[in-house]
Regions:
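HAD-like aspartate-dependent phosphatase fold
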Residues: 1-31, 35-187
Length: 187
């Protein structure tokens, strides 16, 4: 059942929709802008997730947010949403980018900061022999960082990847520029 067609605030009053849920065991949810914004769950989301657990289902969460790890989301779901979860329930764009880079650039030099802690050789300064450039959402983005990325891309023939194509990220007051907007600005 897609969240756009299922109104979770009526979960306990709509018998037909409840019956459809009982046959399902796997549920995939986007987080930001779908079941939550910031540290606030949308009305009915917690009830729906608890109901899924009650019927023996399993919820997985997919997000384009590359700034948080699966463990960060476990903590957020516990502390902010009062929901129990495990790290394997979260698939982030950062995690998927990491998997891609480990498979394709394990011994190469990568221009990004966040992947160093996962065993990849990364750099945040413009230097020769960079093998690829990866751009992610960056809340501390500045002109200096943009200049460094552009210098690498214009002086070296390297692939350029973004962790997600989203132009904007939903937050409590509306939207802010996301990875896709940063990538568009660079290109």
């Amino acid at each position: 059942i897609i969240m756009d067609t299922f109104d979770p605030k009526h979960i306990y009053s709509d018998a037909a929709k409840l019956a459809r849920l009982k046959d399902k065991k796997l549920f995939l949810f986007d987080i930001d802008g779908t079941i939550a914004v910031g540290d606030t769950l949308y009305e009915g989301s917690a009830d729906l997730i608890r109901y899924i657990n009650d019927i023996g289902g399993r919820a997985y969460y997919i997000t384009n947010n590359s700034t948080k790890s699966g463990l960060d989301y476990v903590k957020k779901f516990h502390d902010a949403f009062h929901l129990d979860s495990t790290e394997d329930q979260f698939i982030t764009s950062g995690y998927m980018t990491l998997r891609f880079l480990k498979e394709n650039y394990a011994e190469k030099k990568i221009f990004i900061a966040e992947l160093r802690k996962n065993g990849l050789h990364v750099t945040e300064v413009c230097e020769e022999n960079i093998d690829c450039v990866v751009v992610a959402y960056d809340s501390e983005l500045n002109y200096g960082k943009l200049t460094e990325v552009c210098k690498v891309l214009f002086t070296q023939d390297v692939p350029f990847y973004g962790t997600n194509p989203d132009l904007r990220c939903p937050i409590d007051f509306g939207f802010i520029p996301d990875c896709g907007a940063i990538c568009d600005m660079i290109t």
